[in-house]
Amino acid sequence: MINKLIAIIILTTSQLSAQLELDKKFAIYSFGEGGNLKMLYDRRQRPQALKEGNEIYLVYNGNKVNEDEKPKTMPIITSFNLKTKTFGNSYNLGSASSDHHYCPIIWADKKMKINVFYGAHNSQGIHLISKNKLSIGKSMDDWEKGTFLETPVSYPSFSTSAFGDIIYFRNGGHTTNWRYAQKKDNEKYWTTIDIPTTDLDISGMFEWSSYHSYILSDDKKFMHIAFISYDDNKENNPGRYFNERYNSIVTNDYKYNLYYLKIDLQTQRAYNFFGKSLKLPIDLNTANKDCIIWNTEGRGSGIPPQIIEDKNGNPAFLHVITEENINKLQYYFVKFLNKKWTKSPIRSSNHQWNNADIIFKKNKYHAYLITGDKVIKTPFDDAQKFLNQKGLKNWTKINELSGGYMDKHGGGQIEEWVSEDGINWNFYKKIVPENTDSDWRFNNIQFIKDRFGNQIKDAFIFYGWNISKERQTSGFLYLDN
């Protein structure tokens, strides 16, 4: 008995020492305050960070102007010096709004001017360009208005391709299409590509919609697009919200299946994974026939998957999805292996909107997961509001409430998991910012890129909030030492 007790003490001490040793290998720096839901956005609307030389430029929603449950926040810009490990000047770039979709994105153009775009939710938004190269200045006097797209924009996401700059976006409301615009090196204005990538409801699938994520290929000549689909059901017909797998009304809080589309950015042609040429825009029938990677058979997600190129240069996906019931969720790594798509479980999660991230470095996959043992449900969920309005609580299994407005799109603790083959995964470490405790939740992990679109594999950002009455919020910058 004594020997067993000694062994337990030694094992516990060893585990604590190992975690302390890992803690020394990274540092986390906090920035910003007064944030809203999506203080830093999920992968549909990126980037909020840009590295150039020893500087990391950051934009976010912050500096709230009221204490409402859904506060008004402003687009804020700041910078971080990698040598001095200090933040620079911080100030707002525009007026306050309670719409979290107004979160800014940032990039540098070919003239090395900093660009910021914000305030877009089915609207044209506001585009700012720095007057000086690679400088955010000290006030709005250091910026000028830019010319952006002449079309309604939602979820804008910027990338630098081999053929010029790319903005991928949804063109209007939920049931409209997704498309992209290009700006070549010698051009002043953006050109929206005439034909959308997807328009799911154009062939009779009334109000069918999708959410998208994308990355560029390593050579930046192709676009890897992942999307998930759902019935947007604007008429709020309870029958259309019914999920047969779970025998529940779940509303459009959940999206289904996993689809893939490849775009040649030089020719603007589209292909499925196997190289079949496809006619754009993709409707739901074509998606189900030629683009589907995973028929989830009623298992739902909220956020579209994170995409990565695997060891063989093929697209692979980190996806969170429901399991045997609506209150159990799991992360999967989906990759093409032995002529089929394999779905390898990694770890459980607590919300369908948890925004994890994944990188490949030193011949290993590193997944940074948002985790939690208790599923978060809030009175602000779209499903909850609908069920309350319709008196349908008894029809659902998801009516336990445990969160506030900031928890509407998930949140939890951060864990790093590692795999050499993408099949077998092992826990590596927890990532906990200083001066936070168990009352804090974190979300929307985002690896930083430079102005050429190259991923910085030892630096990412995320945001967090205190679920106690203080309602603190903060952005965080993670750096491997």
Q: What residues fall within each predicted segment?
A:
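Sec-dependent N-terminal signal peptides
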Residues: 4-14
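Extracellular, repeat-based ectodomains that mediate carbohydrate processing or recognition
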Residues: 19-481
